[in-house]
Amino acid sequence: LPANRTFGNSYWLAEELTAVTKELFTTFKYGYYSPVSLGFTSNTWSTIWNGIHQCYMFQESLKQVSNEYVTDEMKKQYLAESNFLIAYYHFLSMRSYGPTMIIRSVIDLETPISGFPERSSIDEVVAFINEKLDEAMSEGGLPTTWSGKDYGRATRLAALAWKSRVYLYACLLYTSP
């Protein structure tokens, strides 16, 4: 019997006898929570920072592309979408952990911990998120709407809506009793 679920491969659940012994949701229930077994927190943390890193890596790679398949218009769109995602991931970090680090570029894998940015204030995080959303909207790469196969991609209206959500979360921090 499998001890852990493999995301995207749930065929084993069709078996008559299936026992799931250590799922993330049982972390507290069975006392598995420890510094080495963080459950949901660990997964959220790594997903956020991997997403930010990949966005900056993509932006670096995009600067080096020069061929007929990737037009300047497409580059502008991709840059705007990656800035939108950088803002989105920083917002997820702020929502999950409060004031957090602001990552402004690719961090080399050999960087010692002392070389990482320190935790920023909530005001700095909110300002950075809104700065990235403004960059995404000002570059002209985000259209107002998408249709067809592009439906669901980042738009100018989504960036404005996300900006309002960022201000809402920041406002709640200051106005809560």
Language model: regions and residue ranges:
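Primarily recognizes Gram-negative and organellar outer-membrane beta-barrels
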Residues: W12, L17-A19, E23
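Short, well-structured active-site flanking segments
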Residues: M94-V106
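Flexible, solvent-exposed coil segments and beta strand-coil junctions
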Residues: L109-E110
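Amphipathic alpha-helical protein-interaction segments enriched in hydrophobic
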Residues: G152-W162
